[in-house]
Swiss-Prot record:
Annotated positions of the O-(pantetheine 4'-phosphoryl)serine modification: S49
Carrier domain span: 11-92
Entry comment on modification after translation: 4'-phosphopantetheine is transferred from CoA to a specific serine of the apo-ACP-like protein.
SUPFAM superfamilies xrefs: ACP-like
InterPro entries: ACP-like_sf (IPR036736), PP-bd_ACP (IPR009081), Ppantetheine_attach_site (IPR006162)
Protein name (record): Probable acyl carrier protein
Family matches, as Pfam families: PP-binding
Length: 92
C-alpha cells in the first residue's frame, strides 16, 4: 500500500517517464531525448496506446491515485506529464 506522504509534492519527471516506457512497453528513449522531443507524438517514440495504458496503470498503482481518462488520450510526453502532475498535485 502506498503511504500517503509519498504522494505529497510528487511529480513525474521525464526520467521516470523514460524508465516507465522501457519497463512497461519495451520502448527505450533516453531522458534528455525525451525532454528535447517532448512535443513529439508518442508514436514517434514507438509507444502505442496500449503501452501508454500500461504506464498509466503503473502510475496509478505507485501513487494510489486514479488518473482521469484524458490522461490515456494524451498524444505527447509534455501533455501527458502536465496532465499527470496536475492530477497528483490535487490528489489528497
Amino acid at each position: 500500500m502506498t503511504d500517503m506522504t509519498e504522494r505529497v509534492g510528487t511529480q513525474v519527471t521525464f526520467e521516470e517517464l523514460s524508465a516507465l516506457m522501457k519497463r512497461t512497453a519495451g520502448v527505450h528513449v533516453e531522458p534528455p531525448d525525451l525532454r528535447a522531443r517532448a512535443e513529439e507524438g508518442f508514436d514517434g517514440f514507438g509507444l502505442d496506446s496500449l503501452g501508454l495504458l500500461g504506464i498509466v496503470a503503473e502510475l496509478e498503482k505507485k501513487h494510489g491515485v486514479g488518473l482521469p481518462e484524458q490522461v490515456e488520450r494524451c498524444k505527447t510526453p509534455a501533455e501527458f506529464l502536465a496532465q499527470v502532475n496536475a492530477t497528483l498535485r490535487t490528489a489528497v
